[in-house]
C-alpha cells in the first residue's frame, strides 16, 4: 500500500518539465520505505490534427527516426450547433462498455483516446484494450483513432490533489485533455466532444472555470448522428438504460449474489474456496465442471443456481457443497435452445431449480422436462460414480466475446416496428440465450446476427446484450462461414496497409540472387554470404493436391560410405518477417492459418505464403535446411543446420508421388531418392512405434466441391498413402532435431511443444465400457503400454472396431501445447503421443507462428544472426505461447465446424442409410458416429419410441431399453453396437442450424 507523503513538485529542465513525487510504501514488517518518482513532461507532443499548423513545426522523430502521422481529419464530421465540426474524446467506461460501437465502421470518426484512458482500460480488461489498440494502430483514412499521451504533455498533465481519489484525478486528466484540445483547435473551428456516461464527470466539465468543453452521454451523442436509427440497437444495455424495463416487469427469479473480493481472497488462502476454468457439458447446458489439482476427478456444478451466471470458459471461484449433495454426471441430454422455449423476453420470471416453484407469468419448464430432470436427479444420487459438487460464488475473469446467433422466432412480434425485447439463440449450444432490445426484430428474423453481452444481473434469468451487426441470411455460404470464423475467434479481415508495407517492394517480381557472392546483392543483404547454395540437390515437395503454400521439400542422396544424405528444406519465412515489424505483430496475433472447406485464412499475406516463401518448383527460393547423415537403419550419424538457397525439381501430390515411386519404369535420380526416403521413413516409424508412439485416429473426411458452382457435392473418408507417412516421418525428425538444438542454445526460452500423459481418470469411462461390453481394457502405465493395449482392442467380426476405440481414446488424451523451456523441468518436456523427450514445430512457418519463432532461435543457435530480445524474454515468450495455443485450438474447431456445415449441405438432397456405431448412451437418447460422413448425432428417445416413459436406462451396462415405434417388442441398445441409421439433413426450427439428423433403423 502506498500513500502520497509530499505534494508533487515540478521543475524546469532544459527540454521540458519533470514532476517529482515522494511516496511512502508500507513494508510487510510494518515499516515504511520512501520512494522518489520522477515523471518527465514534454512540450513537443503533437495533436495529430491535419488542420494544425503549429504541431508539425515542433514534432520530433521517434526511436525509429520516423515522424508521427497526422491522422485526425481537417474536415471532421459536422453536427448541428453547438457541436459543429468536431473530434471525439472518450472516457474509460465508454470504451469498456461500447467497444463494439467504436469498431462499427459507420460511427465514431476522428477519436482521441487519452493515454490515461488506454492505461485504465488495460488494467480493467485486456481483451478490450487489445481491440482499442488495434483500432488506434490500424487507424486509416476512414476511422482515424489516435492515442494522445496526455500523461507526458506539460500542457495536459495534472497532479493528484490532497484527498482526491485516483478515479477523480483521472477524470480531471481527461477533462484537461479536452480543454487543451478545445483551445488548441479553436483557430481551426474544430470543437471537442467528451463522450462519457459519468454524470458527475459531465457536470464537472461544465462547471470548471473557462471550460468550453461539450459533453454528451453515449446515448445523447448517438441520437445526434444522422444514421442514429441504424446504430441505435448497438448501444449496450447498461443498468441505467434498463430501469424502465425493471419497473414494468415482474421477476421472482434471483441468482445468489457473488461473494465479496475480501471473502474470496480469504477463502482461497484458507483452502475453502477453489479457482479454475468452468467447462459446460456439450450434452447438458445445466451442468458444468471445474478441474482442480486437489481432486482426481473434475468437480461438478449442477443447476442454474449453482452455475450462478457462469459462461463456458469463465475463470470462476467455487465452493464445495456438502458430501450429501455430491452426484454423478448427468445421464440426460439437455440443449439450451430447446429448454424454456416459452420464456417471455418481456417478463424475466423464472424457476428456482432447487424448489421448482414456477411463476404464474410464464411456462418455464414443461412437465416432460420436469419429469426428465427428476429422473436424472434420482439416478445421479444413487450412482456409484459420484463426484464432488460445488457452486460458483465469484467470477474471477469473464470469457465474454462477440457471439453469433439468431433471434428466437417465438420471442418476436413480426408485426411490430417498435423496440422489442427478444431472445437470441447462440450457435454455441453450451451457452444460454441472451436478451437484447431491437427495433429491427422482424427484419432480423432470418439473419445470422452478432451480439455482445453487457451484463447478467442477479434478478435476470438470462444475460443482457446488444445487437452488433447482421452477417447475412441464414444458410448462405458467406454468412455461415463468417459466423463460424467469428465463433472461433479467427481474424479474417484483410491485412492492414501497415502490414502490407512490410512486404518486398518488388512484389511478385522478387527473385533470389543468382550468385550468393554478388556484390550488389550482398550490399542489400549482408547475411547472403552465410547461405549454402543447395540448388544442385534433387529436391522435391510432396503435399495435398492443390497445395500452393508449400512449406517443405526433401531430398535424399547416396553417400560414398554407403550412408544417406537426407535433407528437409523449410521455407525461410523469417527472411521476410522481421521481429518488431507490423507484419510480425500481425502473424503473432493470428498465430496460425485456418483451413476451411471453401477457403484458407492466411497467417501471412498471400504474396509470402503462396509465392515468395512457397517452395514452388523450377524457381530459386530461400530455405532453412536440416541435413542428416543416416545409416541404412535410419540412425542419425550427424546433423547440420543451415540457411540455404534451393531449387525444387517437382511439386508432387501424395498420390502423384506414390505413383512415381511405384512405377518401376522410372529409375531417374529423383525417383530413386524418393524411394530411399520412403524406405528410411518406414524404419523411422517402426522405431517410433517401438518406443511407444501412439497411432490414434479421428473421423476425418474430405468434402469435394463442384468445379463450376463451387457447391459441395460429395463426402469421402480421407485416404492415407505411404507417401503421407514419408513426409510425416521426416518432418517429425526435423522437429525433434531442431528442438534439441535450440534448447541447447536457449535453455530458458526455447519454443517447444509438449504433450502430457493423460490421467487415469480420463480413460475411466472408456475402460468401463470396454470391460463391460468387450472384456477389454486400455493400460496407462506408459505410452508403450497404451499403444500395445490399443493394438489388442480388436473385434474379429468388425474391422472398424479398433479404429472406433482409437477415435474414442483420442478424446481422452490431453491436448498438446506450446511452451517455452523455462516454464517446465526437462522431464515435463516429453511428448507423450510421439514418445520423444523433446519436440517443437519447425516445418510449417508459412502457417504457424511457433515455427517462425523456432526459425529465429535456430538462426541464433547456429550463429547466423542474433536472436531478437523478444524471444529471449520469458514473459514475452509466455504471452506468445498462450496466444498460439488458443489460436491453434480455435483453428482446429473452425476447420471441423466448416466440414460439419458442408457435410450437412451435401446431405440436403442425399438422404441415405448408413452404418453407425453407438458411442454414448443416455437416459433420453443415444449418440451414434457415422464413419462415412465423419459426423456424430444424438438420436433422442422421442425418435426411438412412442412411449419414452417406459424406457429404461442401465448405467452399469451402458444400455438403453425401449419399445421401438411400430413395434411391440423391447429393444436393447448398448454402447459400441453397430447399427443402421437413416441419415438426412434437417434445419432446426429454433436454432436455424442445419445438421445431420440420424434415425435408428
Swiss-Prot record:
Residues 422-489 form the CSD2 domain. It is found in: Cytoplasm; Mitochondrion; Nucleus, Nucleolus. GO terms for cellular component: cytoplasmic exosome (RNase complex); exosome (RNase complex); mitochondrion; nuclear exosome (RNase complex); nucleolus; nucleus. Pfam families: OB_Dis3, PIN_4, RNB, Rrp44_CSD1, Rrp44_S1. Residues 343-356 have a biased composition (Acidic residues). Residues 252-399 form the CSD1 domain. Residues 343-363 are annotated as: Disordered. Its cofactor is Mg(2+). GO terms for biological process: exonucleolytic trimming to generate mature 3'-end of 5.8S rRNA from tricistronic rRNA transcript (SSU-rRNA, 5.8S rRNA, LSU-rRNA); mRNA processing; nonfunctional rRNA decay; nuclear mRNA surveillance; nuclear mRNA surveillance of mRNA 3'-end processing; nuclear polyadenylation-dependent CUT catabolic process; nuclear polyadenylation-dependent rRNA catabolic process; regulatory ncRNA 3'-end processing. Residues 904-1001 form the S1 motif domain. Present with 606 molecules/cell in log phase SD medium. Catalytic component of the RNA exosome complex which has 3'->5' exoribonuclease activity and participates in a multitude of cellular RNA processing and degradation events. In the nucleus, the RNA exosome complex is involved in proper maturation of stable RNA species such as rRNA, snRNA and snoRNA, in the elimination of RNA processing by-products and non-coding 'pervasive' transcripts, such as antisense RNA species and cryptic unstable transcripts (CUTs), and of mRNAs with processing defects, thereby limiting or excluding their export to the cytoplasm. This is Exosome complex exonuclease DIS3. It comes from Saccharomyces cerevisiae (strain ATCC 204508 / S288c) (Baker's yeast).
Amino acid at each position: 500500500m502506498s500513500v502520497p507523503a509530499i505534494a508533487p513538485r515540478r521543475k524546469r529542465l532544459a527540454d521540458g518539465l519533470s514532476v517529482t513525487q515522494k511516496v511512502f510504501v508500507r513494508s510487510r514488517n510494518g515499516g515504511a520505505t520512501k520512494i522518489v518518482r520522477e515523471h518527465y513532461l514534454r512540450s513537443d507532443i503533437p495533436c495529430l490534427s491535419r488542420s494544425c499548423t503549429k504541431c508539425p513545426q515542433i514534432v520530433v522523430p521517434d526511436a525509429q527516426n520516423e515522424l508521427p502521422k497526422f491522422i485526425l481529419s481537417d474536415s471532421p464530421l459536422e453536427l448541428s450547433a453547438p457541436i459543429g465540426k468536431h473530434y471525439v474524446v472518450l472516457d474509460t467506461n465508454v470504451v469498456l462498455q461500447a467497444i463494439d460501437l467504436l469498431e462499427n465502421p459507420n460511427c465514431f470518426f476522428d477519436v482521441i483516446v487519452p493515454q490515461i484512458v488506454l492505461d485504465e482500460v488495460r488494467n480493467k480488461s485486456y481483451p478490450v484494450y487489445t481491440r482499442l489498440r488495434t483500432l488506434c494502430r490500424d487507424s486509416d483514412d476512414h476511422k482515424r483513432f489516435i492515442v494522445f499521451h496526455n500523461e507526458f504533455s506539460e500542457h495536459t498533465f495534472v497532479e493528484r490533489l490532497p484527498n482526491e481519489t485516483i478515479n477523480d484525478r483521472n477524470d480531471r486528466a481527461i477533462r484537461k485533455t479536452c480543454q487543451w484540445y478545445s483551445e488548441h483547435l479553436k483557430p481551426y473551428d474544430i470543437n471537442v466532444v467528451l463522450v462519457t456516461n459519468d454524470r458527475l464527470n459531465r457536470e464537472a466539465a461544465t462547471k470548471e472555470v473557462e471550460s468550453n468543453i461539450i459533453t454528451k452521454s453515449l446515448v445523447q451523442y448517438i441520437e445526434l448522428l444522422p444514421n442514429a436509427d441504424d446504430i441505435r440497437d448497438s448501444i449496450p444495455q447498461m443498468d441505467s438504460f434498463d430501469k424502465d424495463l425493471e419497473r414494468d416487469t415482474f421477476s421472482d427469479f434471483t441468482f445468489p449474489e457473488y461473494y465479496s473480493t475480501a471473502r474470496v481472497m480469504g477463502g482461497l488462502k484458507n483452502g475453502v474456496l477453489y479457482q479454475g476454468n468452468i467447462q459446460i457439458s456439450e450434452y447438458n447446458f445445466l451442468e458444468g465442471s471445474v478441474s482442480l489439482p486437489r481432486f482426481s476427478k473434475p468437480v461438478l456444478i449442477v443447476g442454474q443456481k449453482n452455475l450462478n451466471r457462469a459462461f463456458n470458459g469463465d475463470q470462476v471461484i467455487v465452493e464445495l457443497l456438502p458430501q450429501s449433495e455430491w452426484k454423478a454426471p448427468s445421464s440426460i441430454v439437455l440443449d439450451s435452445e430447446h429448454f424454456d422455449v416459452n420464456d417471455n423476453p418481456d417478463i424475466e420470471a423464472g424457476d428456482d431449480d432447487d424448489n421448482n416453484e414456477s411463476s404464474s407469468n410464464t411456462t418455464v419448464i414443461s412437465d416432460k422436462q420436469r419429469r426428465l430432470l427428476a429422473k436424472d436427479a434420482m439416478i445421479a444420487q444413487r450412482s456409484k460414480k459420484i463426484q464432488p459438487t460445488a457452486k460458483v460464488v465469484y467470477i474471477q475473469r469473464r470469457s465474454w466475446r462477440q457471439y453469433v446467433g439468431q433471434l428466437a422466432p417465438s420471442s418476436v412480434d413480426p408485426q411490430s416496428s417498435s423496440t422489442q425485447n427478444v431472445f437470441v439463440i447462440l450457435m454455441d449450444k453450451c451457452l444460454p440465450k441472451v436478451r437484447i432490445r431491437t427495433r429491427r426484430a422482424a427484419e432480423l428474423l432470418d439473419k445470422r446476427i452478432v451480439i455482445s453481452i453487457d451484463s447478467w444481473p442477479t434478478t435476470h434469468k438470462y444475460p443482457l446484450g446488444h445487437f452488433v451487426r447482421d452477417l447475412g441470411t441464414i444458410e448462405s455460404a458467406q454468412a455461415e462461414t463468417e459466423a463460424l470464423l467469428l465463433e472461433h475467434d479467427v481474424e479474417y479481415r484483410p491485412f492492414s496497409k501497415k502490414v502490407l508495407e512490410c512486404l518486398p517492394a518488388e512484389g511478385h517480381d522478387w527473385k533470389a540472387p543468382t550468385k550468393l557472392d554478388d556484390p550488389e546483392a550482398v550490399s542489400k543483404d549482408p547475411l547472403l554470404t552465410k547461405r549454402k547454395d543447395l540448388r544442385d540437390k534433387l529436391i522435391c515437395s510432396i503435399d495435398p493436391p492443390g497445395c500452393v503454400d508449400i512449406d517443405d521439400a526433401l531430398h535424399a542422396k547416396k553417400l560414398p560410405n554407403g550412408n544417406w544424405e537426407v535433407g528437409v528444406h523449410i521455407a525461410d519465412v523469417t527472411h521476410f518477417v522481421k521481429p518488431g515489424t507490423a507484419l510480425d505483430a500481425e502473424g503473432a496475433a493470428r498465430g496460425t492459418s485456418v483451413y476451411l472447406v471453401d477457403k484458407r485464412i492466411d497467417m501471412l499475406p498471400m504474396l509470402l505464403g503462396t509465392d515468395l516463401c512457397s517452395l514452388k518448383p523450377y524457381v530459386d527460393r530461400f530455405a532453412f535446411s536440416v541435413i542428416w547423415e543416416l545409416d541404412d537403419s535410419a540412425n542419425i550419424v550427424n546433423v547440420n543446420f543451415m540457411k540455404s538457397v534451393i531449387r525444387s525439381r517437382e511439386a508432387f501430390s501424395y498420390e502423384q508421388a506414390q505413383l512415381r515411386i511405384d512405377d518401376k519404369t522410372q529409375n531417374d535420380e529423383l525417383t530413386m531418392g524418393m524411394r530411399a526416403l520412403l524406405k528410411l521413413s518406414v524404419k523411422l516409424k517402426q522405431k517410433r512405434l517401438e518406443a511407444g508412439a501412439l497411432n490414434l485416429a479421428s473421423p476425418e473426411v474430405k468434402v469435394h466441391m463442384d468445379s463450376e458452382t463451387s457447391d459441395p457435392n460429395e463426402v469421402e473418408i480421407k485416404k492415407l498413402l505411404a507417401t503421407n507417412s514419408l513426409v510425416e516421418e521426416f518432418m517429425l525428425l526435423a522437429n525433434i532435431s531442431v528442438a534439441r538444438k535450440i534448447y541447447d542454445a536457449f535453455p530458458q526460452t526455447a519454443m517447444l511443444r509438449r504433450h502430457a500423459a493423460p490421467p487415469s481418470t480420463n480413460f475411466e469411462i472408456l475402460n468401463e465400457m470396454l470391460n463391460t461390453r468387450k472384456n477389454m481394457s486400455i493400460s496407462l502405465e506408459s505410452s508403450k503400454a497404451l499403444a500395445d493395449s490399443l493394438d489388442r482392442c480388436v473385434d474379429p467380426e468388425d474391422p472398424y472396431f479398433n479404429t472406433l476405440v482409437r477415435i474414442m481414446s483420442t478424446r481422452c488424451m490431453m491436448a498438446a501445447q506450446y511452451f517455452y523451456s523455462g516454464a517446465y523441468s526437462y522431464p515435463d518436456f516429453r511428448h507423450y503421443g510421439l514418445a520423444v523427450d523433446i519436440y517443437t514445430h519447425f516445418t510449417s512457418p508459412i502457417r504457424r507462428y511457433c515455427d517462425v519463432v523456432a526459425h529465429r532461435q535456430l538462426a541464433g543457435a547456429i550463429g547466423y544472426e542474433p536472436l531478437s530480445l523478444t524471444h529471449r524474454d520469458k514473459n514475452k515468450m509466455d504471452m506468445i505461447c498462450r496466444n498460439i495455443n488458443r489460436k491453434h485450438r480455435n483453428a482446429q474447431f473452425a476447420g471441423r465446424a466448416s466440414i460439419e456445415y458442408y457435410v450437412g449441405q451435401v446431405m440436403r438432397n442425399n438422404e441415405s442409410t448408413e452404418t453407425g456405431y453407438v458411442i454414448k448412451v443416455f437416459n433420453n437418447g443415444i449418440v451414434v458416429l457415422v464413419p462415412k460422413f465423419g459426423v456424430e448425432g444424438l438420436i433422442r428417445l422421442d425418435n426411438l419410441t412412442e412411449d419414452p416413459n417406459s424406457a429404461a436406462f442401465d448405467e452399469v451396462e451402458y444400455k438403453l431399453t425401449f419399445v421401438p415405434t411400430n413395434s411391440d417388442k423391447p429393444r436393447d441398445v448398448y454402447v459400441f453396437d453397430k447399427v443402421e441409421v437413416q441419415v438426412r439433413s434437417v434445419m432446426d426450427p429454433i436454432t436455424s442450424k442445419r445438421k445431420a439428423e440420424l434415425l435408428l433403423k
